[in-house]
Regions:
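The substrate-binding groove and active-site-proximal loops of carbohydrate-active enzymes
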Residues: 1-7, 44-61, 113-131, 170-181, ...
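Aromatic- and glycine-enriched glycan-recognition loops and surfaces
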Residues: 4-23, 50-74, 129, 179-186, ...
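Catalytic domains of carbohydrate-active enzymes, especially glycoside hydrolases
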Residues: 11-38, 140-145, 227-236, 312-320
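Aromatic- and acidic-residue-enriched segments that line the glycan-binding/catalytic groove
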Residues: 40-53, 86-114, 150-170, 292-297
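Aromatic-lined carbohydrate-recognition surfaces of secreted/lumenal glycan-active proteins
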Residues: 72, 77-89, 147-154, 174-216, ...
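Substrate-binding cleft of secreted/luminal carbohydrate-active enzymes
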Residues: 226-258, 263-350
Length: 350
């Protein structure tokens, strides 16, 4: 997207929305807080460096407002995508943090993992701040929902939150960490519903449920089953970025598309909670790295995504999402992307 002016950004947003409509999509999930920052006017977080190249620098217009206007004028929903804990993924991303980035304002809330900086999920004040950010979004913008990515705990290292764990008196570190994450997700859900009960709140966890439970400490099975006043999410959209027949080096095919989707669908789920599936558009032409012989070739057919969508329909899935836009509309393999788009459109716009 071109952030050089509101006019340029609006033109890009209009093209983006038209493109999404052309393949039958009904919702755009737009990243608005990738690094403890904001692609919108916020009193809590600095402007994202993605707008101007410098975190904290005002681009002179409100990108989120433009995206909402362009989406809604075409009948598309728009959800605001938030990374709740991440402040920095590497020394160069973002290249420099604004003075009012939480890493500078509240360093006691922040933990370093490699070159990355993250809010410590065990610190309630940090979680409360994230929830305040969610409330700010739904109170100030006509978004249709809030979407959390899969990044929760940045490491399994017990040293990360050892002091908080010791002070808690809890006996099981993994269970305690899952409680911390669930408390944040539940509070974010409730903040969304407090603003408007018709708004959606969802999470896109990793496609491997074991990783969710034991590495990210996201209790996805409990979230799916919770209902009523205990509801935690309106939907989950696990990232199923593997093809059919996907095989690990061990020979396991658990994560092959045709196996892992039914595994998720078999999980007990509250009637009010939807289950969608994220599909890996970025795999087009690249492959998924599986040990199976067709781990790349099946992603070079021009219809890989459409075949997965057909399979999801036959299994009764609630919906699907594509990651990510550029892979279909700004691809380095335009002929292959064109074919994938045409195959999707034939399914969704017929």
């Amino acid at each position: 997207m071109d952030f050089s002016s509101e006019e340029a950004f609006r033109a890009g947003a209009a093209e983006l929305m038209d493109n999404c409509l052309s393949i039958g999509l009904n919702t755009v999930i737009a990243q608005v807080r990738p690094f403890g920052d904001a692609l919108y006017r916020s009193t809590l977080f600095p402007w994202s460096h993605l707008c101007t190249g410098v975190q904290g620098q005002d681009p002179g217009f409100d990108p989120l407002d433009v995206l909402i206007t362009e989406a809604h004028s075409r009948g598309l929903s728009l959800e605001a995508w938030v990374n709740p804990y991440r402040l920095r993924s590497s020394a160069k991303m973002p290249p420099a943090l604004a003075e009012n980035n939480l890493a500078n304002v509240h360093p006691e809330w922040v933990c370093a993992v490699g070159e990355g900086l993250y809010l410590n999920p065990a610190i309630p004040e940090a979680a409360d701040y994230v929830v305040q950010g969610v409330a700010e979004l739904v109170q100030n913008y006509a978004v249709d929902g809030i979407h959390f990515d899969d990044y929760f705990y940045p490491t399994t290292d017990a040293a990360l939150d050892a002091a908080q764990f010791a002070a808690s008196g809890a006996g099981d570190l993994a269970a305690w960490r899952r409680q911390n994450v669930t408390a944040l997700v539940k509070a974010a859900h409730d903040a969304v519903k407090a603003a408007d009960t018709t708004l959606r709140f969802g999470v896109s966890p990793q496609g491997n449920p074991d990783n969710d439970l034991g590495q990210q400490y996201s209790d996805v099975k409990a979230w799916l089953a919770a209902e009523g006043e205990n509801a935690v999410v309106d939907y989950l959209c696990p990232q199923i970025y593997w093809g059919c027949g996907y095989t690990l080096q061990s020979g396991s095919t658990r994560f092959a598309f045709e196996n892992i989707v039914p595994e998720w669908l078999a999980m007990p789920r509250a009637a009010s909670t939807a289950l969608y599936f994220g599909l890996g558009a970025y795999r087009i032409g690249e492959g998924d790295g599986g040990a199976n012989e067709d781990s790349q070739s099946q992603w070079c057919t021009g219809s890989a995504l459409a075949r997965q969508v057909e399979r999801l329909h036959s299994l009764g899935a609630g919906g699907w999402a594509l990651y990510r836009y550029d892979s279909l509309f700004r691809s380095a393999r335009p002929e292959l992307a064109d074919a994938e788009r045409a195959a999707l459109a034939a399914l969704t716009t017929a």
